[in-house]
């Protein structure tokens, strides 16, 4: 009788252990499934955020070093469907009367003391859409970015501002070939250029960013150095560039069209790999 009871108790105990083991395994499986679903949901949200916020687009520039992009061509591309934003740019070099440029450290270049150096001037529709800012080479430290609504406005580098005692709200004269433009400093940025500087005008510290009209007044031309466009969605970039290339009466032998789609495609592929 005692043997029968003992065997029965042992069987029950074994079933309990087996049941607990099965319960633990099922709990682990459900935890892993929930974790996988959470990761997939997180990556899906990340993908949507990346697609919504990244600056996928293309730029048009002349194939000639000193060439220009006609404003009428730039505006025709701007009005294509699915263009989310644009940024027109005009670049030149100019003098800054009464101001001292930052010297090129270790360049070995000696300028005549009677010859004033020139700063690089970039006029833009929106300063925050310039490659230096979207690529994180420059960071806005004070003030605000320039928009298409600003007139006679500029951003200056922190080092240049400190050397000349400049602060937001101050006036700054810019001269080019007898033309003069007075701008108000709206903001101060910091950072370095992508490439080493040889001349003063190559230095980020001597880079002056203005509204587009101010730079065009200095050059005496309404034409552009570069026109940049951003797609509403990364998946629309190819069709958008194809439509730009098929615009009538545009000689694409004279212009280059480059896009940054390959950079962001890798990011999206990595996210998709984790999802799968």
Label the model's feature ranges.
Residues 62-65, 87-108, 178, 198-204, ...:
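Subset-of-secretome marker
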Residues 19, 30-56:
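Alpha-helical transmembrane segments
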């Amino acid at each position: 009788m005692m043997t029968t009871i003992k065997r029965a108790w042992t069987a029950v105990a074994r079933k309990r252990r087996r049941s607990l083991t099965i319960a633990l395994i099922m709990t682990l499986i459900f935890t892993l499934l929930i974790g996988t679903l959470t990761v997939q949901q997180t990556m899906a949200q990340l993908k949507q955020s990346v697609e919504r916020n990244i600056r996928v687009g293309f730029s048009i520039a002349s194939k000639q070093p000193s060439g220009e992009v006609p404003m009428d061509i730039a505006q025709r591309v701007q009005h294509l469907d699915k263009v989310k934003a644009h940024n027109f740019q005009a670049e030149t070099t100019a003098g800054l009367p009464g101001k001292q440029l930052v010297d090129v450290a270790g360049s070995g270049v000696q300028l005549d003391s009677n010859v004033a150096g020139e700063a690089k001037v970039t006029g833009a529709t929106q300063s925050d859409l310039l490659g230096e800012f979207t690529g994180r080479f420059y960071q806005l430290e004070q003030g605000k970015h320039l928009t298409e609504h600003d007139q006679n406005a500029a951003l200056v580098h922190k080092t240049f501002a400190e050397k000349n005692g400049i602060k937001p709200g101050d006036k700054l004269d810019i001269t080019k070939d007898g033309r003069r433009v007075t701008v108000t400093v709206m903001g101060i940025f910091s950072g370095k250029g992508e490439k080493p500087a040889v001349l003063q005008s190559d230095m980020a510290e001597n880079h002056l960013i203005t509204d587009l009209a101010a730079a065009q007044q200095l050059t005496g031309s309404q034409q552009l150095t570069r026109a940049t466009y951003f797609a509403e969605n990364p998946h629309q970039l190819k069709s958008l560039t194809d439509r730009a290339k098929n615009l009538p009466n545009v000689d694409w032998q004279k212009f280059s069209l480059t896009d940054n789609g390959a950079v962001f495609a890798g990011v999206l592929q990595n996210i998709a790999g984790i999802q799968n």
